[in-house]
């Protein structure tokens, strides 16, 4: 038996053991875990330093190092996310609908756990805790497979979770970490249909595509963020400038950062110099501009076709000038990764049209796309941002990690 199969078996067994846990027990444990994370900050930072040192040795970019880095403040934020999950209403056992049918059968539809969730993710070690807390609150066991660059951090975090579970009298196998970073083991996890009920990949386009091609278990696709901001003809240009600067430069390595800028031709000649001057005072950006936008910049390079399809995760942004709202919507729908999109406008009708017709999980009017986040949306720590339409869409909180079951009660009923 392979190590992966042993992990799968333990997770499956654990899912049965934690299925009956009450809301009170789950919430008490999550509060305990939140405190343990803060108390054990120095141990977690020491493990993270090993990952950062390895990353530096291998020439990882500063932006990608930021994704990997833990700090005292970030650990505190992770702990706050766990506590927020504890404070959320428990969806398990929630009655979605109940009725008596024509035969007199009493039928209830309730929320139930999925069972065993597998998570394959890259770089960001906070995902280990975020994913576990949501899975545990919904009575699911979870198997975590992080990237090799965050292995020391993930091992320390999962060790802390398992120790906390054991101290609380709960099976530590509710969380499993795949420590082997090989692609063969990851592929085995993708095909573990005997043990895994759903697989959630969280990372770049290459990871998502690999999972889509190789997985045999059901997959919820997440994460890739080719995110656009459209500056409309009726935009407040000062507002647009502030929003673009925030969405591009605040944390360019995250999936809700803006990658593409679409500008109405009526304001392009005013807006582009204004934006370029303002953003250079914060953080210079490499502009990859189309033929109409290029001469309006002091410094830019001609965009290639692939630039409009790329999640840069860096201080780089594609720029497209359009002649109408309809062209902007068409362009965005052609190039979107269905994550988050935004329009800056004072035209209420244009805003409504944009929100109705743009095909994305989150569509903003006059706000930065950086808000697409489970914590910000009040869902607690998110397990990912789904870019598909089934079974979940957008930031995935507790309800996204549940299924439903029909409970039918009769009194000797038979069907003629």
From Swiss-Prot:
Q: Where in the cell is it found?
A: Cytoplasm
What are its GO cellular component terms? cytoplasm
InterPro entries xref list: Ald_DH/histidinol_DH, Ald_DH_C, Ald_DH_N, Aldehyde_DH_dom, G-glutamylP_reductase_CS, Glu-5-SA_DH, GPR_dom
Q: Please give the Gene Ontology molecular function terms for this protein.
A: glutamate-5-semialdehyde dehydrogenase activity; NADP binding
> Which SUPFAM superfamilies does the entry link to?
ALDH-like (SSF53720)
Task: Specify where it is mainly localized.
Answer: cytoplasm
- Its recorded name reads Gamma-glutamyl phosphate reductase
Q: Name one GO biological process term.
A: L-proline biosynthetic process
Recorded catalytic activity of this chain's protein: L-glutamate 5-semialdehyde + phosphate + NADP(+) = L-glutamyl 5-phosphate + NADPH + H(+)
**What family name appears in the similarity comment?**
Belongs to the gamma-glutamyl phosphate reductase family.
Q: What does this protein do?
A: Catalyzes the NADPH-dependent reduction of L-glutamate 5-phosphate into L-glutamate 5-semialdehyde and phosphate. The product spontaneously undergoes cyclization to form 1-pyrroline-5-carboxylate.
